[in-house]
């Protein structure tokens, strides 16, 4: 049975930047919220598209040939295989929609990389 999820409240509960939390699933995809600030890392997802929706603040998604600026309410889909680096100058809350197989930082592993198991845990 599905439950109502307040995305704003879910994002506010997060304490760590760049540590997504799964708030729902749709078929073979997860719906995640994250609190972000600063730069994540350049990476790509070879087999999966990744949807970013800004809930609060502003997010820049750097691509190799351009940068995409998103404000509250804007969304952007990074196509599979496209190298990108999300950046937030100030704290920003985002919703991510991605396949369950999508690795957090794609083809690279850094200190901020979170496993799916970590993303499924309730925020502390």
Walk through the language-model features, giving the residues of each.
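Double-stranded beta-helix
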Residues: 3-11, 24, 89-124
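A cytosolic small-molecule/anion-sensing beta-strand core signal
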Residues: 27, 55-56, 71-72, 90
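Short, charged/polar surface micro-motifs in flexible loops or helix N-caps
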Residues: 28-30, 37-39, 56-60, 67, ...
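Short, conserved beta-strand element in jelly-roll/cupin
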Residues: 35-36, 45-62, 97
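Short beta-strand His + acidic residue motifs that chelate non-heme Fe in jelly-roll/DSBH
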Residues: 43, 61-62, 78, 83-89, ...
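Short glycine-/acidic-enriched loop or helix-start segments at secondary-structure transitions
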Residues: 63-64, 72, 88, 106
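Short acidic-glycine-tyrosine-enriched beta hairpin
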Residues: 64-80
């Amino acid at each position: 049975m599905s439950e109502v999820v307040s995305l704003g409240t879910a994002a506010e509960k997060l304490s760590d930047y760049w540590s997504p939390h799964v708030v729902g699933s749709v078929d073979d995809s997860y719906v995640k919220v994250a609190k972000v600030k600063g730069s994540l890392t350049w990476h790509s997802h070879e087999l999966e598209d990744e949807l970013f929706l800004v809930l609060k603040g502003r997010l820049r998604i750097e691509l190799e040939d351009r940068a995409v600026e998103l404000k509250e309410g804007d969304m952007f889909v990074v196509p599979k295989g496209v190298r990108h680096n999300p950046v937030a100058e100030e704290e920003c809350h985002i919703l991510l929609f991605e396949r369950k197989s999508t690795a957090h930082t794609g083809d690279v592993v850094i200190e901020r990389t979170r496993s799916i198991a970590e993303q499924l845990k309730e925020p502390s």
